[in-house]
């Protein structure tokens, strides 16, 4: 029997890097909502009293970027007396956006391998490798450690926003260690929560007293509600629970650490349980395969697991800049497949169109901000891009495709047995 502990982390929307992801995706939403053909590569930097947005944009949209950025920062919770050196109203907002390089644009506008099919005309916006993953740890087919870390981070933000724990400030991190036996989760070993807070907590000013109070409150208001519907729950006696191990966390957010777009790519995906191609998501329009192809790879992997063709599935895609069709497609089922990896790969090649233009069209990636009232990608920029039933993400809806795959596999087996 193999036994091991696997750990994943998440961060709240007030973490400096996550502020940047949300700002970059808010810029993307605003541009696509007016002009769905916008080309966007927006990077954000935050530090004490400063937010800079930079990158490349080609669009017919008219956006007040400074107003937009301030609204995102305010919504996260950095405003007024609790802003801590990074106030939505008073921070400097700098905008340095250029147009997309014509050398890149020509390859995206017309793929090198197009053959008259309109979907062939959209070439990949860059070379790269992307991974998608799914497993049957949870109902949303995500690894349990990252799923639970996100639950805790979201609940931590929720009790701050609703005033249940009024001393909490926006910055925070969670980390969960899960015990696996034979690759199945059997216990929650450790939960770690680091959360920014006011210098005094409900009349308590000494460091030990503050830490004890926060520990008690977080178990009651964060851990228990976040895990209430899980079959595998933490146990107050058996699960190690660590809160603010350094003692206090008063200085946080951009005042404590600079933030950058794209520095939480493992948090955004599978918590390290699957491989990652290295490309970030936020601030990138759908022609960037770092984003769109990673969504498609997750869709494929989730379809395979939902269809019962594997308990775990990892899909690798690779692309060349300016070329529509993937350079390679590979499926790995880690010995859990109902059929071989080669057969799974053949099923994927036969039943999924993984050209960028086809991915964009299938998931309506250019239209989603417009269809959802001007906001879509910003909501994916915190608490993960996958396994999010709260967001109704098109790449998570696999019911129909999984059924088609199952039928195709059954037909394939029937034909094989008749030979």
UniProtKB/Swiss-Prot annotation:
Gene Ontology MF: a single term: methionine adenosyltransferase activity
Cofactor binding notes? Binds 2 divalent ions per subunit. Binds 1 potassium ion per subunit.
Q: What is its EC class? A: transferase
Top-level taxon? Bacteria
Query: Per the UniProt entry, what is one GO biological process?
Result: S-adenosylmethionine biosynthetic process
Keywords annotated in UniProt: ATP-binding, Cytoplasm, Magnesium, Metal-binding, Nucleotide-binding, One-carbon metabolism, Potassium, Transferase
Instruction: Please give the cofactor(s) recorded in the UniProt entry for this protein.
Output: Mg(2+); K(+)
Give GO cellular component annotations, separated by semicolons.
Answer: cytoplasm
Q: Does the keyword Transferase apply?
A: yes
Report residue spans for region: Flexible loop. 100-110
Catalytic activity field: L-methionine + ATP + H2O = S-adenosyl-L-methionine + phosphate + diphosphate
Q: Which Pfam families match?
A: S-AdoMet_synt_C, S-AdoMet_synt_M, S-AdoMet_synt_N
- Pathway recorded for this protein: Amino-acid biosynthesis; S-adenosyl-L-methionine biosynthesis; S-adenosyl-L-methionine from L-methionine: step 1/1
Query: Could you say which EC number(s) this protein's record lists?
Result: 2.5.1.6
User: Which residues are noted in the entry as ATP-binding?
Assistant: 15, 171-173, 248-249, 257, 263-264, 280, 284
Q: Where does K(+) bind?
A: 43
Where found, per UniProt? Cytoplasm
InterPro entries according to UniProt: ADOMET_SYNTHASE_CS, S-AdoMet_synt_C, S-AdoMet_synt_central, S-AdoMet_synt_N, S-AdoMet_synthetase, S-AdoMet_synthetase_sfam
Which residues are noted in the entry as L-methionine-binding? Answer: 56, 100, 257, 288
| Subunit comment | Homotetramer; dimer of dimers.
NCBIfam families assigned to the protein according to its UniProt record, in alphabetical order: metK (TIGR01034)
Q: Which HAMAP family match?
A: S_AdoMet_synth1
Write out the function statement from the record.
Catalyzes the formation of S-adenosylmethionine (AdoMet) from methionine and ATP. The overall synthetic reaction is composed of two sequential steps, AdoMet formation and the subsequent tripolyphosphate hydrolysis which occurs prior to release of AdoMet from the enzyme.
Q: Which family is annotated? A: Belongs to the AdoMet synthase family.
> Which protein is depicted?
S-adenosylmethionine synthase
Originating gene: metK
């Amino acid at each position: 029997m193999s036994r091991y502990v696997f750990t994943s982390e998440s961060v709240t929307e007030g973490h400096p890097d996550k502020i940047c992801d949300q700002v970059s995706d808010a810029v993307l939403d605003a541009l696509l909502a007016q002009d769905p053909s916008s080309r966007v590569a927006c990077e954000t930097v935050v530090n004490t009293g400063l937010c800079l947005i930079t990158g490349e944009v080609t669009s017919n949209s008219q956006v007040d970027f400074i107003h937009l950025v301030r609204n995102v920062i305010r919504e996260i919770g950095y405003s007024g007396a609790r802003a801590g050196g990074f106030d939505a109203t008073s921070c400097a907002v700098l905008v340095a956006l250029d147009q997309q390089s014509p050398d890149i644009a020509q390859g995206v506008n017309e793929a090198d391998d197009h053959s008259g099919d309109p979907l062939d005309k959209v070439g990949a916006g860059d070379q790269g490798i992307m991974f998608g993953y799914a497993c049957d740890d949870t109902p949303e087919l995500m690894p349990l450690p990252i799923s639970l870390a996100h639950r805790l981070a979201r609940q931590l933000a929720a009790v701050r926003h609703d005033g249940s724990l009024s001393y909490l400030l926006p910055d925070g991190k969670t980390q969960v260690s899960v015990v696996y036996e034979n690759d199945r989760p059997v216990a929650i070993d450790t939960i770690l929560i680091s959360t920014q807070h006011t210098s005094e907590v409900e009349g308590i000013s000494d460091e030990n007293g503050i830490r004890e109070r926060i520990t008690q409150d977080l178990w009651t208001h964060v851990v228990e509600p976040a895990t209430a519907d899980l079959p595998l729950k933490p146990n107050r006696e058996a699960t190690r629970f660590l809160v603010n191990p350094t003692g206090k966390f008063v200085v946080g957010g951009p005042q404590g650490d600079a933030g950058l777009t794209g520095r939480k790519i493992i948090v955004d995906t599978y918590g390290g349980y699957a491989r990652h191609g290295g490309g970030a998501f936020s601030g990138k329009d759908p022609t960037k395969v770092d984003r769109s192809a990673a969504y498609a790879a997750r869709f494929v992997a989730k379809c395979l697991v939902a269809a019962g063709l594997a308990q775990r599935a990892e899909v690798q895609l690779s692309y060349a800049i300016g070329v529509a069709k993937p350079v390679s497609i590979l499926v790995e089922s880690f010995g859990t497949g109902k059929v071989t990896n080669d057969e799974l790969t053949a099923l994927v090649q036969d039943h999924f169109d993984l050209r960028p233009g086809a991915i964009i069209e299938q998931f309506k990636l250019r239209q989603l901000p417009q269809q959802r009232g001007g906001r879509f990608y910003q909501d994916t920029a915190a608490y993960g891009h996958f396994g999010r039933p709260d967001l109704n993400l098109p790449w998570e809806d696999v019911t129909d495709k999984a059924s088609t795959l199952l039928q195709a596999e059954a037909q394939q087996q029937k034909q094989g047995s008749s030979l």
